[in-house]
Design a protein with these regions (language model features):
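Short, structured beta-strand segments at or near domain termini in extracellular proteins/domains
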Residues: 1-4, 160
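Conserved "HGTGT" condensation-loop signature of ketosynthase/thiolase-family condensing enzymes
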Residues: 8-361
Length: 361
């Protein structure tokens, strides 16, 4: 059982964080720094140091680049000697469900003091050593397990689970005052920046509008044309939003929302499978069947490695996600946070992006 307030009988989610590699839409960072940031911040939020971690449960896809990245992140976090595992050899990669399934099992491992061996493991194939074993291990009186996950868009997440000891009370501020710096709205072939027209297309249909808007920016990023329409919309809005804005790679976060998410691309992906069979499924389309990939494309373009998150919401005023943005700004000491509502479905498109500055910093 998981709870936000640890007791002697329950496993607590004592800390958590997310980050982005800002590197590649489908390939992991080669340095491991993005995942390390999430691991570091999850431990910090829980008031736990590397020496206090008893178990390390990694994403562990058994692919060369991912495992290399994870080993480097664990090394940067000071966790190379902590017993480490991946549970995917037992039940495969359950895609979006893998994080929650494996977190539940991590909680059970903490309670039982049994750390499962990595099924099929024979030898390390990573550049930074990890404490991996094929055998189950008994761990006496374990208190803390760090669980990580990574996904498309270079998204990383980490949670620090605690058992048998209450999470320490945080002395950090719970929210920050945020001041609006700039607002961008896109709809009907037009880009408005702070109520002033910044670009008007000759056509309102999205394909014509997006091409003309992108060309007007005079950018040389040809990867724009490979993106799905939702990501193109977010990419364009962020381009005008962040013009001339300076920040460190960890000083900006992204909080996004929408009603439809990636549904338009989900439908297109399924139509390919229905008409041509499973073997014709396009990796170039599949990678965009997650709404967080919008934030990933923005992060790659603008070198943002701070925390990002997606919420399902119909609130175009963004009153709900702005509250979360203020919490995020305080907990991660952000200089800026992007709050955005974005939707694309059946050719209809709408985006509002606001850049919020942390005035308590």
């Amino acid at each position: 059982m998981l709870t936000k307030t640890g007791t002697s009988e329950l496993v607590a989610i004592a800390g958590g964080s997310a980050s982005d590699d800002a590197n590649h839409i489908s390939g992991p960072s080669r340095t491991g720094d993005g995942l390390y940031f999430a691991m570091r911040d999850a431990m910090s939020e829980a008031g736990v140091g590397p020496a206090d971690v008893d178990m390390l449960q990694m994403h562990g896809t058994a692919t060369a680049y991912n495992d290399e990245m994870e080993s480097k992140a664990a090394g940067l976090a000071g966790l190379s000697d902590v017993p480490a595992q991946s549970l995917k050899p037992y039940f495969g990669h359950t895609m979006g469900a893998s994080g929650i399934i494996e977190t539940i099992l991590a909680a059970e491992e903490l309670k039982r003091g049994i750390f499962l061996g990595v099924k099929g493991f024979e030898e390390l194939g990573v550049p930074v050593p990890l404490n991996v074993s094929a055998e189950n291990r008994l761990i006496t009186n374990p208190h803390h397990c760090l669980k990580t996950a990574s996904g498309f868009g270079g998204t990383n997440a980490a949670v620090l689970l605690s058992f048998g000891t209450p999470a320490p009370a945080s002395a950090k501020k719970t929210s920050s005052a945020l001041n609006p710096v700039r607002r961008v709205q896109i709809s009907q072939g037009q880009v408005n920046v702070d109520e002033t027209s910044a670009f008007v297309s000759s056509q309102t249909d999205f394909h014509t509008f997006s091409r003309e808007a992108f060309k007007s920016r005079e950018e040389a990023n040809m990867k724009f044309y490979k993106m799905d329409d939702l990501c193109k919309l977010g990419y364009l809005a962020s381009a005008w939003l962040l013009d001339g804005i300076e920040y460190g790679e960890e000083e900006c976060g992204i909080v996004m929302s929408g009603k439809y998410g990636c549904l338009d691309t989900d439908i297109r992906h399924q139509q390919i499978i229905d008409s041509e069979g499973d073997s014709s499924a396009s990796p170039a389309v599949f990678v965009y069947t997650l709404p967080n990939v919008v934030a990933a494309e923005i992060s790659i373009r603008h070198h943002i490695k701070g925390e990002n998150i997606w919420f399902w919401s119909e609130d175009k005023t963004m009153s709900d996600i702005k509250k979360y943005a203020s919490i995020l700004a305080a907990s991660r000491d952000l200089k800026y946070c992007i709050a955005a509502h974005i939707d694309f479905i059946n050719g209809d498109y709408f985006a509002i992006f606001e850049l919020l500055e942390n005035t308590d910093r």
